[in-house]
């Protein structure tokens, strides 16, 4: 069983290393007045993805998942958050409606 687990970990590492996916977020930093809508963009180079996920990270804390969009979906909504996915253009956008002081955080997108 230990050998199987070791091979599985090695396979996962090789899959990660062999990926040619590049992910870019624009803007790198953003400041908006309270109550304004916030728009964050994420672009990726390979349209053959399984899903795209947006995360939030508060200072000194771990990542919190916000929205997960499967490759077959075009958007996902949760409360004031809405994320869209356009695989053909390699782009996702996270919209946060009516920004609040508590929205101050680092936002990240990840593709798989």
From Swiss-Prot:
Keywords: Adaptive immunity, Cell membrane, Disulfide bond, Glycoprotein, Immunity, Immunoglobulin domain, Membrane, Receptor, Signal, T cell receptor. GO terms for cellular component: T cell receptor complex. SMART domains: IGv (SM00406). Residues 21-112 form the Ig-like domain. Glycans are attached at residues 41, 82. Residues 1-19 form the signal peptide. Pfam families: V-set. It comes from the Eukaryota. It is found in: Cell membrane. The keyword Disulfide bond applies. Its main location: membrane. Disulfide bonds join 42-109. GO terms for biological process: adaptive immune response; response to bacterium. V region of the variable domain of T cell receptor (TR) alpha chain that participates in the antigen recognition. Alpha-beta T cell receptors are antigen specific receptors which are essential to the immune response and are present on the cell surface of T lymphocytes. Recognize peptide-major histocompatibility (MH) (pMH) complexes that are displayed by antigen presenting cells (APC), a prerequisite for efficient T cell adaptive immunity against pathogens. Alpha-beta TR is a heterodimer composed of an alpha and beta chain; disulfide-linked. The alpha-beta TR is associated with the transmembrane signaling CD3 coreceptor proteins to form the TR-CD3 (TcR or TCR). The assembly of alpha-beta TR heterodimers with CD3 occurs in the endoplasmic reticulum where a single alpha-beta TR heterodimer associates with one CD3D-CD3E heterodimer, one CD3G-CD3E heterodimer and one CD247 homodimer forming a stable octameric structure. CD3D-CD3E and CD3G-CD3E heterodimers preferentially associate with TR alpha and TR beta chains, respectively. This is T cell receptor alpha variable 21.
